[in-house]
Amino acid sequence: MKTSLRFAALMLLVLPGAVMANEKLVQDRQCMGCHALKEDGAAPSFQKIAKFWKGKGNAEVAMVATIRKGSAATGGPHWNKATMPDQSERPLVSEAEARQIAKWILKQ
């Protein structure tokens, strides 16, 4: 019982930090220049993206590809006329960072 309580307490401390770290990564990689959490701007909101991908088995893989290569290269979904630029037009995002970002978006 003590171990379970300690683990639960540890998770309460660690998980919010992980969520904040992913949000910071999204900000550091300038994703918020086009996207916002709840409202559409130049690009769809993260909540709209999460809703679109909800329940799709290939969501994370497809999102990672789009985050890394841009939507034109991957044939990814397009909202309105906005397309995700490739990494020549924005900060470099590693494979691991793209996975973190995709997982964070899917939790929105």
Task: Give the ranges of each region predicted by the language model.
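N-terminal signal peptide c-region/cleavage motif recognized by signal peptidases
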Residues: 16-21
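Immediate flanking context of iron-sulfur cluster ligation sites
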Residues: 23-25
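The canonical Cys-X-X-Cys-His
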Residues: 30-37, 101
